[in-house]
UniProtKB/Swiss-Prot annotation:
Specifically catalyzes the cleavage of the D-lactyl ether substituent of MurNAc 6-phosphate, producing GlcNAc 6-phosphate and D-lactate. Together with AnmK, is also required for the utilization of anhydro-N-acetylmuramic acid (anhMurNAc) either imported from the medium or derived from its own cell wall murein, and thus plays a role in cell wall recycling. Pathway: Amino-sugar metabolism; 1,6-anhydro-N-acetylmuramate degradation; Amino-sugar metabolism; N-acetylmuramate degradation; Cell wall biogenesis; peptidoglycan recycling. The keyword Lyase applies. It comes from Burkholderia lata (strain ATCC 17760 / DSM 23089 / LMG 22485 / NCIMB 9086 / R18194 / 383). Its EC number is 4.2.1.126. Residues 55-215 form the SIS domain. It catalyses: N-acetyl-D-muramate 6-phosphate + H2O = N-acetyl-D-glucosamine 6-phosphate + (R)-lactate. Transmembrane segments: none annotated. InterPro entries: Etherase_MurQ (IPR005488), Glucokinase_regulatory_CS (IPR005486), MURQ/GCKR (IPR040190), SIS_dom (IPR001347), SIS_dom_sf (IPR046348). The gene is murQ. SUPFAM superfamilies: SIS domain. A lyase-type mechanism (elimination/hydration) is suggested for the cleavage of the lactyl ether bond of MurNAc 6-phosphate, with the formation of an alpha,beta-unsaturated aldehyde intermediate with (E)-stereochemistry, followed by the syn addition of water to give product. This is N-acetylmuramic acid 6-phosphate etherase. One of its GO terms (biological process) is peptidoglycan turnover.
Length: 301
């Protein structure tokens, strides 16, 4: 499909007089347009669920999650990948983001190269068993199309995230996540509604994949990495809430657990030492809920 025919490139009748509006009215217009994006993303939930399953299965088997895109789309994937290690304790390199031309994306022309998409995946050590998520608002960015083709040829599972329905990217993917965001307030500026939709989708793909892998207990980030005072206080609060103990008890357990909330919670809930908690976690694939379910009621603290 030619660029000028894409929904994301069409003029938005609601904002035809954008430059004549006062600041409050212009902001209200943008807010109204943005407000409908979550409902549009909701139509793609079945496809997003399929994507989560693919990602969780790959990570469980030792594969990686690789986001790849150009411009704003690529930066959204890069930022989502960047947050996974401190939030969920993923291993370095387990979830990565690749942006055409690097994060700064100074040379916009690189998105026109399908060869560069393949080369960047190879430079990242693409291997069978990885999952590649191609992010492209238009659904036709050559850099992303080349990356998806190469990933598919390598034997990787592929997911396309696009903001135009019936896209070329979708045809190259095992899972096609397409959201019709409608025309942008600023014609063709897909960093706006399309970017918001892509951010929502990436949030769901990574977060619910981590939930499926046992990286949470309830809605608590039990693998959060403790790198500063704020995160330490947060980790203490997580242990306190999960184990139902005062914060001073939670703090001592966290120290004994080597600053790992998951282990501290198991120590307190199962009444075991650090080594015992680590064994419980390993036997349950890291899931606190599954680990506690293996204990007799009388052994739970």
């Amino acid at each position: 499909m030619h660029l000028e025919h894409l929904v994301t490139e069409q003029p938005n009748g609601q904002s035809a007089n954008l430059d004549a509006l006062g600041i409050p009215d212009a902001l209200a217009l943008m807010n109204r347009e943005d407000a409908g994006i979550a409902a549009r993303v909701a139509h793609a939930l079945p496809a997003i669920a399929s994507g989560v399953t693919v990602i969780a299965d790959a990570l469980r088997a030792g594969g990686r999650l690789i986001y790849i895109g150009a411009g704003n789309s690529g930066r959204i994937g890069y930022l989502d990948a960047l947050e996974c290690q401190p939030t969920f304790g993923t291993q370095p390199g387990e979830i990565i983001g690749i942006v055409a031309g690097g994060f700064a994306g100074i040379t916009e022309s690189v998105e026109d190269s399908d060869t560069l998409g393949r080369q960047d995946l190879d430079a990242a050590g693409l291997a069978r068993g990885d999952v590649v998520v191609g992010l492209t608002a238009s659904g036709r960015t050559p850099y992303v199309l080349g990356a998806l083709r190469h990933a598919r040829d390598t034997g990787c599972r592929t997911i396309a995230v696009a903001c135009n329905v019936g896209s070329e990217a979708a045809a190259l993917a095992d899972v096609a996540i397409e959201v019709d965001c409608g025309p942008e307030v600023l014609t063709g500026s897909t960093r706006l509604k399309a970017g918001t939709a892509q951010k929502m989708i990436c949030n769901m793909l990574s977060t619910i994949s981590m939930v499926a892998l046992g990286k949470t207990y309830g809605n608590l980030m039990v693998d959060v990495q403790v790198h500063n005072h704020k995160l330490r206080r947060r980790a203490i609060g997580i242990v306190s809430q999960a184990a139902g103990v005062p914060t001073d008890v939670a703090e001592r357990a966290l120290e004994q657990a080597g600053d790992r909330p998951r282990i501290a919670i198991l120590m307190l809930c199962a009444g075991v030492d650090r080594a015992g908690a680590e064994r419980l976690a390993d036997a349950a694939g890291g899931s606190i809920r599954k680990a506690l379910a293996t204990l007799a009621p009388s052994t739970r603290a």
